Amino acid sequence: MVMVGNIKNNLFGWFRHSPPDALFDRQLVWIALCLMLTGLVMVTSASFPISSRLTDQPFHFMFRHATFLCLALGTSAVVLQIPLQKWQSHSHYLLGIAFALLVVVLIAGKSVNGASRWIPLGLFNLQPAEVAKLALFIFMSGYLVRKQDEVRATFFGGFMKPIMVFGALALLLLGQPDLGTVVVMLVTLFGMLFIAGAKLSQFLALMVAGITAVVGLILIEPYRVRRVTSFLDPWEDPFGSGYQLTQSLMAFGRGEWFGQGLGNSIQKLEYLPEAHTDFVFAVMAEELGFIGVVLILALIFSLVIKAVFIGKKAFEHQLQFGGYLAFGIGIWFAFQTLVNVGAAAGMVPTKGLTLPLISYGGSSLIIMSIAVSILLRIDHECRLISMGNKTDLQTDEKE
């Protein structure tokens, strides 16, 4: 027991405290790269059958995902050079761009399966909803820094204004329709307001209102009602509304403890729809088994915990904007992972959300890579402040 305790403490210490002389969090970089590599491998495996059928090229989606990955890494390298102050001062412009893109996609967007969520850009289809998530969280972080006292003191002045901004975004998103993104944004927004010190009574009242609104949005659309009913009992109509979920559950069952082996999934052979996108986790469960998916989930939630630690460090160094944004990114990644995994496992209705840094999709991969890059930038600026304080202290001691 003592040995286990020592290993646990050493592992936690290594995870929480990266080398003090480094200018960035190396552990966060390795975690993100491991998730991206896992995504490339699993997209290659899961997309093999559909690539062969649609393009006669079994590695078509692998090449596209690899291209997205290179774009994501290149974009992240550029974003890493941008100071936090620039993000804060230009947050309203980013939000304006997100609004414009959401309007464009409703007018000239590409429709897939009845949903108009993509703007064709040649190399890939841009999904404005992904841009809107990050833009809202950056804007909210700046707002909470400017209006922190109002958020804590008044209901309309500080609390309802950001909800109104979210409401405008939500209306455009529901026009696509994209309820899943709306729910992710709402939960993350609630979390950021709670961290900012919003009154618990107001927070709970708004949460009840939010849940009521989501339930109402489900009830007014027959296809959403079918999704919920099929999620509650997919075996009632296994070849109709419950088909995707029953195939996903069979993939989980076949995986058992150690999986069928990489590339050996049966469900991806035209049985499980969206095997390389929304339901890539089911293919992972079948091929890698319970042990494999637990390790991958541990990686994702390691990234989430890293975001929380970075946010805490930012608040300690008086980087309020960075603190709110780091916590927002952490909540976003955590909740979206829970929804994606829950949908694949039959615990929540399907929402069409990607598994962070793993699922196929250029917009999601690039935007989430940018979010990780911003986390690295927040940590970097905290380290620069610490190094500056340490240098000042050493100078004072010499004097």
UniProtKB/Swiss-Prot annotation:
Protein purpose: Peptidoglycan polymerase that is essential for cell division.
The pathway that the record names for this protein is: Cell wall biogenesis; peptidoglycan biosynthesis
Q: Which UniProt keywords apply?
A: Cell cycle, Cell division, Cell inner membrane, Cell membrane, Cell shape, Cell wall biogenesis/degradation, Glycosyltransferase, Membrane, Peptidoglycan synthesis, Transferase, Transmembrane, Transmembrane helix
Please name the top-level EC class of this enzyme.
transferase
| A cellular-component GO term for this protein | cell division site
Origin organism is Vibrio vulnificus (strain YJ016)
Q: Which PROSITE patterns match?
A: FTSW_RODA_SPOVE
The UniProt entry lists membrane topology as: Multi-pass membrane protein
Gene designation: ftsW
Q: Name one GO biological process term.
A: peptidoglycan biosynthetic process
UniProt topological domain (Cytoplasmic) ranges:
1-27, 86-91, 140-154, 199, 311-320, 376-399
Topological domain ranges for the Periplasmic compartment: 49-64, 113-118, 176-177, 221-289, 342-354
Per the record, the domain of life is: Bacteria
What is this protein's record name?
Answer: Probable peptidoglycan glycosyltransferase FtsW
Q: Which InterPro entries match?
A: Cell_cycle_FtsW-rel_CS (IPR018365), FtsW (IPR013437), FtsW/RodA (IPR001182)
Q: What is its main location?
A: membrane
Q: Which family does it belong to?
A: Belongs to the SEDS family. FtsW subfamily.
